[in-house]
Amino acid sequence: MKNYWFENKDADANGTCLQFRISIDQDFVWDHFGPSHFSGESVDDKVLAEWIFENQDGKVATLYDWKGSSQRNEWHIGAHDAETAHLFEIWLSNFHKREMQKQKIRA
């Protein structure tokens, strides 16, 4: 089974909630996914940056900071269920590893 995710800022992320946490440098996130899909601050000032992803099956996951974490390498993974979040976490971890290996090869 392929596990592929792509950014889709128009995907319906309503009802997603924290399922997992992941540590990835903020520069990596911004460099690879571009500007946040979320503009401004949330109504409750708890989210400053968020990206929405969708997989080949139409499942939605979000990657976001929570309460403007002072440690900008800590991100939350949100989804409608833990299985979807876990698939996204696997994809993101593997994507991060591949991109970091590419950087080492170039250096």
Question: For each of these PLM feature ranges, what is it?
Answer:
Residues 31-35, 68, 93-97:
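Short, intrinsically disordered, mixed-charge
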Residues 1-24:
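N-terminal trafficking/processing presequences and adjacent post-cleavage segments
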Residues 21-23, 54, 78-80:
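A structural detector for beta-sheet-dominated domains
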Residues 61-87:
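Intrinsically disordered, low-complexity regulatory segments enriched in Ser/Thr/Pro
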